[in-house]
A protein has these predicted regions:
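N-terminal low-complexity, intrinsically disordered segments
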Residues: 1-80
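Aromatic/basic-lined ligand-recognition segments
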Residues: 4-7, 110-189
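Short glycine-rich, low-complexity/disordered patches
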Residues: 9, 48-59, 102-125, 145-160, ...
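Beta-strand elements of well-folded, non-transmembrane domains
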Residues: 23-27, 82, 117-122, 196-198
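Short, conserved charged micro-motifs
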Residues: 27-35, 85-88, 128-129, 201-208
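Amphipathic N-proximal alpha-helical interface segments
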Residues: 57-81, 175-201
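Internal, hydrophobic cores of structured domains that mediate oligomerization or house catalytic pockets
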Residues: 70-141
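Long, compositionally biased interface segments
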Residues: 186-236
């Protein structure tokens, strides 16, 4: 599927709530030793970090990130209020490459980047439908107009659709739709979750470059999916 390329832009405000970067590697048979070394050295690196050593994994957390390490995979979560662009997250990880190289042995098996956007809103009046909210936050090229929704659709209080396709050689999965506030069903939340996956084995240096490409795809798809009205709000 061909998604138009968009020039990169850092918005003053966003609806981004989750930035997650997952990658896998061959099982590290010296993981216990790696944990011991990392616990000691990371506290010197970042004194604000909270380190939790579990039997099967290691958690390192600050207000700006949470990293979870296993013997064969790693989950990195970044605070979007601090990491205002994915480039900052990539730079941060690249500066810690000695930790990751000793963990993965310079061999990445799979990489996935996931971003979740939550867009609050509401029905304009009692005559409008919840499903019509989708047409307000998503572009016409991405979702159908309210007039084309079925009677069943117009009575929904939540709807999440999943779609998977290939873009520039990377697998992309979208989860999108809306849900209602349980206490006030006129208050709605739009949801757009975009994930890109690279399942080609590569060295750490290529893994970093691929992550930048994957994030670029997410950026392009976000712009393709979101309405001009929402993009205008993000510029303020």
């Amino acid at each position: 599927m061909d998604i138009p390329k968009i020039e990169h832009y850092i918005y003053p405000s966003t609806f981004l709530r989750t930035i997650e970067w997952v990658f896998t590697y061959p099982q590290n048979k010296e993981f216990e030793d790696w944990k011991t070394h990392t616990v000691t050295s990371w506290k010197k690196l970042d004194q604000k970090s909270k380190v939790q050593v579990k039997q099967e994994y290691l958690d390192i957390q600050t207000p700006n990130y949470k990293f979870s390490f296993w013997s064969d995979k790693c989950i990195l979560r970044f605070n979007p209020d601090y990491f205002t662009s994915f480039g900052l997250a990539v730079e941060f990880i690249d500066n810690l490459k000695d930790y990751f190289l000793s963990l993965c042995g310079n061999k990445i098996k799979l990489s996935r980047i996931r971003k979740v956007n939550l867009i609050p809103g509401g029905r304009e009046d009692d005559d409008s439908t919840n499903i019509g909210f989708i047409g307000c936050i998503f572009s016409d090229r991405f979702v159908q107009k309210e007039d084309n929704y079925t009677e069943f659709d117009q009575g929904l209080v939540a709807k999440i659709t999943q779609a998977t396709f290939i873009n520039n050689g990377y697998e992309v999965t979208l989860n999108y739709g809306f849900s209602c506030n349980k206490k006030d069903n006129s208050q709605l939340m739009g949801i757009l979750e975009i994930s890109t996956i690279d399942n080609k084995i590569c060295a750490f240096s290529n893994f970093i470059k691929n992550a930048e490409r994957m994030n670029g795809i997410i950026f392009d798809i976000f712009h393709w999916c979101i309405s001009d009205e929402i993009l205008a709000i993000m510029k303020n």
